[in-house]
């Protein structure tokens, strides 16, 4: 197999990979209710106390009496009716590259609802079919002050001698928000409550594009399952209802995630459901009994922010797995760590990608050299193989035997030119996912006209240069292909690749371009070495 056939193999493998992942995203029917306005009410969102995952009857009790909570990285809007987070702005991330507006992860708008809810159900709960508690606050705006590392925002409600205090606890430079329920029972009898925390979002499908497939939907982690996606289609087909001591429930989208993590040593209930065009995923903490004259605090943590692996891993076990590298995670994860380490030194993600390319291609150089050497030996055998075919004609069995004897005599592995390519493809695919899933590349500039490595090149300069580099590799590579159709396909291959890469994120195109430049340099060195051995001629 010669170099040009290798290029064809790479193209077929790569395009097949893209088509497969897109089919994998699209092979299920579209969920219902996408893009339509839903009539939503807060009390109808409250899960039942029974733990069966079914909602209680809807009731019209909604409020927009809001308070705002601001830190250095988060701006939250909280409804005082129940204390739901109905908006979350990520202050360190712009909505668009050229926009000064912050990215809004959670929002509650007509036709587009994505909020984080929490409350108390049970015999003495304050969130039920009859309505939700109107919580009292001391101010409308709360801000983390300069020099302050923690902000606590209490919201209170008093009923039947019991004081319920819902407190949002936020820390500087953190996307983890602790939600505490303190129940001070000064009544004459014991009180029984159960805390729930859930995420609610419109049922929708966001599979991205062929070149950048993305997932939008649910996910969870339990004692027995580190990480599993549970799509909106899954929620409509079957509601989850499972018990776990450790775990979390989350909603995912490209680059960002929201998740509830119960803070309880006892088993919690993890559930999903779909109702009225909305999908829910959440957790119920175990039922708690508070004796008369005592108080107790129940806590769950809300992660609402970007997919930052180190920070998420510190917040909850396996939450970092929401950065989904697919089945090649064991390659992609170390590549991302190496990329991040390089960026911490050079200070630019584009330069880090270039450096990573040099490191990866340098590590694979022995394979590349073995590949070119094997192909050169195969070319030297072509006259003998041609003569053998003419001599043996249609006797395929004898032809196969004599070919194997010739390969053994000349110490040539007929798969030697193909195997290195097959071994290199998983590395490229893993790097592809590493770059696609890295929120750090979002809106990160390179040089000149590249202002966002996660977006396509606005002027298509990098894809065109990549196409030119592929064409140069072809021209430098000797070939034994004589079939006119194969020659046309190989000539067209750089054009096809250039077209595909027009729509790829510029960070990935940069990797491929630099990789091609390295290939040209390695080809030159290897061919010079082969010339000295008489295995290559210019």
Curated annotation (Swiss-Prot):
Specify whether Transmembrane helix is a keyword of the entry: yes
GO MF entries? membrane insertase activity
Its subcellular locations are: Cell inner membrane
Spans of biased composition, class Polar residues? 28-45
Membrane topology note: Multi-pass membrane protein
Annotated Gene Ontology cellular components are: plasma membrane
Disordered as annotated region, ranges:
28-62
* This protein's UniProt keywords: Cell inner membrane, Cell membrane, Chaperone, Membrane, Protein transport, Transmembrane, Transmembrane helix, Transport
> Some GO term, biological process aspect, for this entry: which one?
protein insertion into membrane
- InterPro entries, per this entry? Membr_insert_YidC, Membr_insert_YidC_N, YidC/ALB3/OXA1/COX18, YidC/Oxa/ALB_C, YidC_ALB_C, YidC_periplasmic_sf
Q: Which residues cross the membrane?
A: 6-26, 340-360, 415-435, 453-473, 494-514
Q: How does it assemble?
A: Interacts with the Sec translocase complex via SecD. Specifically interacts with transmembrane segments of nascent integral membrane proteins during membrane integration.
List the PANTHER family.
Answer: CYTOCHROME C OXIDASE ASSEMBLY PROTEIN COX18, MITOCHONDRIAL, OXA1
The record, for NCBIfam families, names:
PRK01318.1-1, PRK01318.1-3, yidC_nterm, yidC_oxa1_cterm
The entry's function note states: Required for the insertion and/or proper folding and/or complex formation of integral membrane proteins into the membrane. Involved in integration of membrane proteins that insert both dependently and independently of the Sec translocase complex, as well as at least some lipoproteins. Aids folding of multispanning membrane proteins.
**Which family does the similarity line name?**
Belongs to the OXA1/ALB3/YidC family. Type 1 subfamily.
The molecule here is called Membrane protein insertase YidC
Q: Which species does the entry assign this protein to?
A: Photobacterium profundum (strain SS9)
């Amino acid at each position: 197999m010669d170099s040009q056939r290798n290029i064809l193999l790479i193209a077929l493998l790569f395009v097949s990979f893209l088509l497969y992942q897109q089919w994998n995203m699209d092979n299920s029917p579209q969920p219902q209710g996408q893009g339509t306005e839903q009539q939503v009410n807060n009390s109808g969102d409250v899960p039942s106390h029974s733990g069966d995952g079914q909602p209680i009857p809807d009731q019209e009790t909604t409020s927009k009496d809001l308070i705002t909570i601001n830190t250095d990285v988060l701006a939250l809007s909280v409804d005082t009716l129940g204390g739901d987070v109905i908006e979350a702005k990520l202050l360190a991330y712009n909505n668009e590259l050229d926009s000064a507006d912050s990215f809004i992860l959670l929002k509650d708008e007509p036709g587009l609802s994505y909020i984080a809810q929490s409350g108390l159900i049970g015999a003495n709960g304050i969130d039920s079919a009859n309505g939700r508690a109107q919580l009292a606050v001391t101010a409308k705006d709360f801000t983390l002050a300069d020099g302050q590392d923690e902000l606590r925002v209490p919201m209170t409600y008093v009923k039947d001698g019991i004081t319920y205090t819902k407190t949002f606890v936020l820390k500087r430079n953190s996307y983890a928000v602790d939600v505490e329920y303190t129940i001070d029972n000064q009544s004459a009898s014991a009180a029984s409550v159960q805390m729930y925390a859930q995420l609610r979002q419109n049922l929708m499908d966001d599979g991205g594009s062929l070149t950048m497939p993305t997932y939008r939907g649910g996910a969870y982690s339990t004692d027995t399952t580190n990480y599993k996606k549970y799509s909106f289609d899954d929620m409509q087909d079957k509601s989850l209802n499972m018990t776990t001591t450790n775990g979390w429930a989350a909603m995912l989208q490209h680059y960002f995630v929201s998740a509830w993590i119960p803070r309880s040593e006892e088993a919690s209930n993890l559930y999903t459901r779909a109702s009225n065009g909305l999908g829910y995923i959440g957790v119920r903490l175990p039922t708690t009994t508070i004796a008369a004259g005592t108080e107790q605090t129940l806590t769950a943590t809300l992660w609402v922010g970007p997919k930052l692996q180190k920070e998420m891993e510190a917040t909850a076990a396996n939450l970092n797995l929401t950065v989904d590298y697919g089945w090649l995670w064991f390659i992609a994860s170390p590549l991302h760590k190496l990329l991040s380490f390089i960026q911490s030194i050079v200070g630019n993600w584009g330069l880090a990608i270039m450096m990573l390319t040099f490191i990866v291609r340098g590590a694979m150089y022995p394979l590349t050299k073995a590949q070119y050497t094997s192909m050169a030996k195969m070319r030297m055998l072509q006259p003998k193989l041609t003569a053998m075919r003419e001599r043996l004609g249609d006797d395929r069995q004898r032809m196969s035997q004599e070919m194997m004897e010739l390969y053994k005599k000349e110490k040539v592995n007929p798969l030697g030119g193909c195997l290195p390519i097959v071994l290199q493809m998983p590395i490229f695919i893993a790097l592809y996912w590493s770059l696609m899933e890295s929120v750090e590349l979002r809106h990160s500039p390179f040089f000149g006209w590249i202002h966002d490595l996660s977006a396509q090149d606005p002027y298509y300069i990098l894809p065109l240069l990549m196409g030119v580099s592929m064409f140069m590799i072809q021209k430098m590579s000797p070939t034994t292909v004589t079939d006119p159709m194969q020659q046309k396909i190989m000539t067209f291959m750089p054009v096809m690749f250039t077209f595909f890469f027009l729509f790829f994120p510029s960070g990935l195109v940069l990797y491929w371009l630099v990789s091609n430049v390295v290939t040209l340099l390695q080809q030159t060195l290897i061919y010079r070495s082969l010339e000295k051995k008489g295995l290559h001629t210019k």
